[in-house]
C-alpha cells in the first residue's frame, strides 16, 4: 500500500527549498494555484493566522520552519539571539490557538535548541529538526492510511459510501492526509463507491479543497451542503464518517472543524460509524476533557460577507471555527501509533505509552 500511495501522490502544500519556506496559498484554490515564499517567523505566523496554510499538521510543520527562519534572522542581527528568538516563539504560538500540533512543533524546536552543544551549528540543528518534523508527518500519514483502511475492511469488504468534513488531505498535512489519506487508501483497495464531502462553511474547505483533491485523483466525490449530512446518512447508505482532528484530549474528546460534533450525533442516530484520523502529535494528554480545549472564534465578517459584500444587514455573527465531539460518540481514533476503538482515558494512556510505528 505504501508504494501505491507514493505512486498516486499528486498534491503538496509545503516546500522547504533554498532556505525558504514555500506555501501553496489555500485561500485561492481551486481557482488559482499560487505559491508564496516566507523568510521570517512573523511572515509564517501571518500565513498561519490568515489561513494561507491550514490543517493542524501543516500548521505545526510551518511553525517549525518559522522558528528556523526566526533563528537565522536573530543570529544575523547579533547580540543575545536566543532571548530575541523568544519573541518569534510567542508570535507563532499566538497565530492559531486550537491546533495543538502548533504547540507540539514549537516545543520540539525549543527542546532541540536547549540540547545544542558547544560549537554546534544552531541553524544546521534546527533545520534538521524542522525537516524531521515534516518528514515524520508524511510517514505518519502513510501508516494511518493503512490502519484506517484495515478498520474499514474489517467491517465490510465491499465498495461503500463515505462522508468527510473540512479538508484533511495533502493540503492539510505533510503529505497524503489524515482522514483523506485513509479514504485514498480505501479507494485504491476498491472499498469506496463514493465520497460525500461537506462544503464546510464558512471557508468552504470541503468545497474548495477536498472536492478538488479527490477529483484530481479520480475518486468519485459529491459535494453537499453541511445541512444535508443527516439526510444523506439516511438515504445514501453511508457506512463511515471519517474526519481529522485539531486536538484530542486524554479522555478521547476531539476538537475539529465546526460541524463535526453534529455529524457525530447524527451518525450515532443512523448507525453510521465515526472515525477520527490524526497523528499522535494532535493528542494533548495535559487536557483532561474537551471542556478544557480553547475554541478559536474568528471574525464574524466571514459569515456576514460574501465576496466582500455584506449579505446580512444590521446583525451580529457568532463564528466559532471548532467544536468538541465527546469520546462516547467516536467509534475509533486512528493514529500512527495504533487504533483506539471506543476511546476512553485508559485506552488513550495506553496508546500514548507505545513507541511510534514508523
Swiss-Prot record:
Protein name: Methylthioribose-1-phosphate isomerase
Highest taxon above the source species: Bacteria
PANTHER family: METHYLTHIORIBOSE-1-PHOSPHATE ISOMERASE (PTHR43475:SF1)
Location of the active site: 246
Transmembrane stretches, start-end: none
Pathway(s) it belongs to: Amino-acid biosynthesis; L-methionine biosynthesis via salvage pathway; L-methionine from S-methyl-5-thio-alpha-D-ribose 1-phosphate: step 1/6
InterPro entries recorded: IF-2B-related, IF-M1Pi, IF_2B-like_C, Initiation_fac_2B_a/b/d, M1Pi_N, NagB/RpiA_transferase-like
Cited function: Catalyzes the interconversion of methylthioribose-1-phosphate (MTR-1-P) into methylthioribulose-1-phosphate (MTRu-1-P).
Residues the UniProt record annotates as site (Transition state stabilizer): 166
UniProt KW keywords: Amino-acid biosynthesis, Isomerase, Methionine biosynthesis
Catalyses which reaction(s): 5-(methylsulfanyl)-alpha-D-ribose 1-phosphate = 5-(methylsulfanyl)-D-ribulose 1-phosphate
Positions of substrate binding: 54-56, 96, 205, 256-257
GO molecular function: S-methyl-5-thioribose-1-phosphate isomerase activity
Protein EC: 5.3.1.23
A GO BP annotation: L-methionine salvage from methylthioadenosine
Record bears the keyword Isomerase: yes
Similarity section: Belongs to the eIF-2B alpha/beta/delta subunits family. MtnA subfamily.
Pfam families reported in the protein's UniProt record: IF-2B (PF01008)
Signal sequence coordinates: none
